[in-house]
Amino acid sequence: GAVTQPQKGCSAKGGHSRDPFAGERVTTFAGLLSMIHERVPGIQRLRFVTSYPRDFGDDVLEVIRDSPRICRYLHVPAQSGSNAVLARMNRGYSVEEYLEFLDRARAHLHQPEINRPLTLAGDIIAGFPGETEDDHEATKRLLERARYKNCFIFKYSARPGTVAHEKLPDDVPESVKRRRNNELLALQQRISAEVGREFVGE
């Protein structure tokens, strides 16, 4: 049967559930991916982006591993390498949990020996409210550990309507945001070049 309301009542961790609003049967994201791969052979390459690390279960990794037309590309934003900053962002995971997910993803999906390496991408925000130099250095360490092929790095800017804008003072000076942003960009540029050379070597 058709997949209905895949965005509601969906769990990345396990079996089917029901939409509490419509009473319809829904599927997991892993099930949806597998179904599209199997039932729509005309799609030559399947790729999805911007995954929330807290909800990314092994079932999704296994579907990607076992489905040759699903790209082994994961864009999983970290936003910061500091647990204090992540808590202020209300991200719902720690640096340690995030890195553990990257390790699991690599264990499942990085198979250069069969020409199927895993490519990782991330997002980082520099100068989030309350970010200290220690927090900034922790984010540098995260970049070194994560070894993204590419990472989208931006200076924080307050956005009306967001919790950060309403509740957190934008207390990192613009010059400091700019310096930290440039340092992270330079570091990621080096890492991207190194990862690119590793891919060529594989």
Describe the predicted segments one by one:
Residues 72, 84-202:
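A structural motif corresponding to the C-terminal lobe/cap of the Radical SAM core domain
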Residues 1-133:
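Conserved SAM/AdoMet-binding glycine-rich loop
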